[in-house]
């Protein structure tokens, strides 16, 4: 699975949507992978900004994550540089699996106001839902063994931090 190709599919979808729809959209990426995608989409679409949502304090496994959740929240805090109330928001994540992270992101988002609409866009959908959450746009439906996780990585191109490519790496799930 080619993460760059999947990114191009997301970009093409948003460009086609912008051509048909007069209402502006706001991008909000889930930290960390979704935020990378939102940042690049905003740049490629020439949008003035994008938001970042950190779900650390809204996760249902917060007690299990402990200090790791706090460090995550500190490393990339929620930042929404637009008015959430009444906005049409595209929530972006790298991988959709159980739906629990998206649920946590919606809780965090609604702490900032009530959007007019929220759509979900993901690079990869692994299935295996625990909650009734479905992405509005999926780069690709993928099958990955249960003992593995799909991790999005960002590779710098041309020595410029603003020029980077995406790739997926399979890693063994921690015991």
Where would I find each of the regions flagged by the language model?
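PRPP-associated nucleotide enzymes
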Residues: 1-175
